[in-house]
Amino acid sequence: MSSLMVLSRRAMVLGALSVPSLAYAQSGFDSWVASFKSRAHSRGISQRIIDAAFANVRYNAEVVERDRNQAEFRREIWDYLDLVVSESRVTNGRRAFRDNRRLLAEIEDRFGVPAAIVCAVWGMESAYGARRGDIPVIEALATLAYDGRRGRFFEQQLMAALRILEAGHVRSRNFVGSWAGAMGHTQFIPTSFEAYAVDFRGDGRRDIWSDDPTDALASTAAYLARFNWRRGMPWGVEVRLPSDFNFAQAGRDTTLMPSEWARQGVVGVDGRAVPDYGSAGILLPAGARGVALMTFANFRTIERYNASEAYVIGVGHLADRTAGGGPFVASWPRGDRGLSSAEAAELQRRLNAAGYNAGAVDGRPGPQTRAALRAWQSSVGLPADGRPTLHMLERLR
C-alpha cells in the first residue's frame, strides 16, 4: 500500500492542530518544562537524571487527545467480557500460566494471592506482556501535567517517575508505557510503583519493564495483598436465584453469609449451597435476566487495582477460565441494551410523571432513579432489579 494512502492516528491528531497552535503549545510546554525541571532539582533530583529524562521530550498532542476522549462509549458488560475474556485470551492465559507456573506458585506462596488472579491481571493489563506501551513515560506525564486537566495528579506522577530513574530501577531509554504513564507488564503508575512494587528477583532493582515479568507479577500480588486479599476466599461465584428473589436485596451493600443466602434459595449453579467463605452480596451486572454473582471481600480488593466493576468481573472470570473453569452458565440479555444519556433522562422524566420520584432529570441514573424504577417495576409485575434498559423505557412510553 502506498505511503500516501496511509494516515496514522498521530498524523491525524497533529493535523487537527494548525501549525501556529501546535507551535504555541510547544512553546508553552517548553516554558513549563523549564519551570518543572527547576522544581525537581530543588526536591533532590540530580541534574544528570533531569537532563537525561527530558532529552528529546516534546509536547505530545496524541496523548492530550486520548486523555480528553477517554470517556469511552458505553459498552455492555457482555460486549466487554467478550473482548477481555475472549477464547484467544483464555488460551494465551493458560499458556502463560503453564510457562510461568513455578514463578506464579512462588509468588502465591509469598503473598497469598492466587496465581490465576495474578496471571489474569497480567492478561488484562498487557495481554501477558505483549502490549506494555511504547510511549516515553516522561513525555506522556509532562504533556498531561502541562495540559492541566488533571495537572496536579500528573505532576505528582512525573516527580515520582524521576525518582524511579534516580533510584536506577530503569534506564531512560527503556522507560516507556501507556499514554497515561502506566508502566510495565501490569501497568503500575509511578506513585503506586514507589509504594508497592517489589524486587522479587533480588537484584536490587524493581524491574517491571523488561521481558522478564518476575518483578511485575510479584508487585501485583504485593499490591493486592497490601489491600487485604484474603487467602482461601474467591472473588465471586456464579449463582442461581430463586423465582421469588427479592431484588431489593441485590447489590454489594446487602451482605449475608452464603449459608444464609442458601436459606433464601440462592445457590451455586450446580444447585448446592456456596461454602461460607465470608459475607457476600449479590451482584447483577445485567439485571434480573443475566448472570448473577455472589461477590466477596476480594472483589473490593481487585477494585483497588481498577475501580471499574466490569474490570473486576473481567479479572475474576479470566482467572477462573485460566484455572480451567468454563464460561458463565447463565446467558446475557444481549437484546436489551442500556440507555444513552438522552434516553436515561427520558426515563427519569417518565418515572417522575408517573408518580415515582426519580430525582433530577440529569441523564445519569443513580440510586434514586434505580429505586424509583424498582418501585414502578414492582407495580407492573416485573422483576424489580432497577436496571435502566431500553426495554424498560419502551414499557414506560
Question: Predicted regions span which residues?
Answer:
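N-terminal secretory signal peptides and thylakoid transit peptides that target proteins
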Residues: S2-L17
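Short glycine/proline-rich, acidic loop/turn segments that cap or connect secondary-structure elements
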Residues: S279-L293, S341-L351
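Short acidic, glycine/serine/threonine-rich helix-capping segments at coil-helix boundaries
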Residues: L339-A344, N352-L396
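Catalytic glycan-binding domains that act on GlcNAc-containing polysaccharides
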Residues: Q47-Y277, G290-L293, T301-A319, A323-S341, ...
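Mature N-terminal segment immediately following signal peptide/propeptide cleavage
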Residues: F29-Q47, D51
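Boundary at the C-terminal end of the N-terminal hydrophobic targeting segment
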Residues: A23-A25
